[in-house]
Amino acid sequence: MRSLRFLTLLTAILAAPALAHHGWGWTDGGEFTLTGTVAAADLGNPHGVLTMTVNDETWTVEVGQPWRNAQAGLTDAMLAPGAELTVEGHRSADPAQFLMKAERLVIDSQSYNLYPDRS
């Protein structure tokens, strides 16, 4: 019984960072806009990630889950290295992190809304 409690506690401790990260709680809650150039993109699971160059800084931008990206109309080809885009969403609450969660991407004047229910 004691080892079962220990395993349950250990599982909860190890899962906490992942649960805290997914969702919006790690952001500062304010609106944030970032315009730059795609250095790399991965629209895979558990959620897509863009690496962008903005004024000589490297930013990590979390986009939606694969189904959400597809529903918004995003494709890998749109996010090829060198593509310029604007991302609207929320940045990390830690200002030392160049990290944000995207709600919308604007590519060639076309808006791709990942979270239409949050608008």
Annotate each language-model stretch with its function:
Residues 1-5:
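Positively charged n-region of N-terminal signal peptides that target proteins for export
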Residues 36-38:
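Conserved hydrophobic positions within beta-strands
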Residues 71-87:
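Short nucleic-acid-contacting surface segments enriched for D/E, G, S/T with interspersed K/R
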Residues 18-32:
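Short boundary/loop segments of OB/S1/cold-shock single-stranded nucleic-acid-binding domains
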Residues 92-116:
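OB-fold/S1-family single-stranded nucleic acid-binding modules
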Residues 7-17:
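Bacterial N-terminal signal peptides
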